[in-house]
Amino acid sequence: MMLEHVLVLSAYLFSVGLYGLITSRNMVRALMCLELILNAVNINFVTFSDFFDSRQLKGSIFSIFVIAIAAAEAAIGLAIVSSIYRNRKSTRINQSNLLNK
């Protein structure tokens, strides 16, 4: 596959994730959009690593680290969302101000 096709795909995923993150009112949807952004970045890492220096695996290794951090972020984020849902009975971002009530 050519470099331009992969970069267009990555830019599309990044823009969809960014749009969803900005317009989302649900915390779970915002976490999913954040994961979409991180996956677009991983595609860029692997693509540029393969395109510019295919003998070294720096982009792939860095991508694995980003995946591990994203998994930890998703676990912590979902734990926070479930805690807020138990207390507030809602996962809407504008209703999750914990300083009220």
From Swiss-Prot:
Keyword Translocase carried by entry: yes
Superkingdom of the organism of origin: Eukaryota
Keyword vocabulary terms for this entry: Chloroplast, Membrane, NAD, NADP, Plastid, Plastoquinone, Quinone, Thylakoid, Translocase, Transmembrane, Transmembrane helix, Transport
InterPro entries assigned to the protein according to its UniProt record, in alphabetical order: NADH_UbQ_OxRdtase_chain4L/K, NUOK/Mnh_C1-like
EC class (word): translocase
Gene3D superfamilies reported for this sequence: 1.10.287.3510
Pfam families, alphabetized: Oxidored_q2
Major location (coarse): plastid
GO biological process, alphabetically ordered: ATP synthesis coupled electron transport; photosynthesis, light reaction
One GO location term (cellular component): chloroplast thylakoid membrane
Subcellular location(s) of the protein: Plastid, Chloroplast thylakoid membrane
Entry keyword Transcription regulation: no
MF terms in GO: oxidoreductase activity, acting on NAD(P)H, quinone or similar compound as acceptor; quinone binding
Its membrane topology: Multi-pass membrane protein
TM ranges: 2-22, 32-52, 61-81
EC number: 7.1.1.-
Subunit structure: NDH is composed of at least 16 different subunits, 5 of which are encoded in the nucleus.
Its job: NDH shuttles electrons from NAD(P)H:plastoquinone, via FMN and iron-sulfur (Fe-S) centers, to quinones in the photosynthetic chain and possibly in a chloroplast respiratory chain. The immediate electron acceptor for the enzyme in this species is believed to be plastoquinone. Couples the redox reaction to proton translocation, and thus conserves the redox energy in a proton gradient.
Family assignment from sequence similarity: Belongs to the complex I subunit 4L family.
Protein name as catalogued: NAD(P)H-quinone oxidoreductase subunit 4L, chloroplastic
Species: Daucus carota
Lineage: Eukaryota, Viridiplantae, Streptophyta, Embryophyta, Tracheophyta
Name of the encoding gene: ndhE
